A protein has these predicted regions:
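SAM-dependent Rossmann-like transferase core, predominantly class I methyltransferases
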Residues: 85-163, 168-183, 194-203
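N-terminal auxiliary segments of SAM/dcSAM-dependent transferases
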Residues: 28-104
């Protein structure tokens, strides 16, 4: 078997600031467009327009199950007070530059949805590209894979599912990260062996 080792960037997430309460709505029966306007107004000086569009799509998909087409065609849809308040809270947290993935509790990776929390780093686009490259170049060939600093487990789970017969190990020093990764493995029915290890102190000769 060919061996593949992933070594992740090691960092400690910053503590998130407690969020403020917004007062963008005065009525309980408001159309979706007013929530979209709130996002643009509160976040326009912090994020570029394209990123705000991405936030809007993710928020309405998560809270309402709406597709981008739904958002475009049904902006006059009346949303419940509960939905409006949730959007207010999400917008406030975004204004504090908290990642949208941590706010919503998930991230998409290689066509699958993974649970995510501040105890695990959010995978970068280049990480997804590298994972797809490994899959493409080793299609049908089982590998021995070590995902070091696995975080959410998205790489380990994706490779275990995409390269059948591979032996996949996932290491992390963080108990919280391993719990998230194991949850994702169960969610996707992927066979991955998890270990709590400090890769900076581990003796590779063992």
């Amino acid at each position: 078997m060919i061996g593949v080792v992933f070594l992740h960037e090691i960092s400690i997430p910053k503590n998130q600031n407690s969020f403020l309460t917004l007062h963008g709505f005065t009525n309980i029966d408001l159309p979706m467009q007013q929530s979209i306007d709130l996002l643009r107004r509160k976040l326009g000086e912090i994020y570029p327009p394209g990123e705000i569009i991405g936030f809007t799509r993710m928020i309405f998909e998560s809270l309402c199950g709406y597709t981008p087409t739904d958002i475009l065609l049904h902006k006059d849809t009346i949303l419940s007070e509960d939905i409006h308040r949730k959007i207010e809270r999400i917008t406030d947290r975004l204004s504090q530059q908290e990642p949208i993935q941590y706010i919503l509790g998930y991230t998409d990776f290689c066509g699958r949805r993974f649970d995510i929390a501040p105890g695990a780093l959010i995978p970068r686009p280049e990480t997804e590209e590298l994972t797809r490259l490994v899959i493409t170049e080793n299609s049908g060939q089982p590998l021995r894979i070590a995902d070091l600093g696995t975080g959410s487990g998205c790489i380990a789970v994706t490779l275990a599912l995409s390269l059948p017969g591979s032996k996949v190990e996932a290491w992390d020093i963080s108990t919280e990260a391993l719990e998230i990764a194991q949850c994702n493995a169960r969610k996707h029915n992927a066979h991955v062996n998890f270990f709590q290890r400090d890769i900076l102190r581990y003796d590779v000769s063992e």
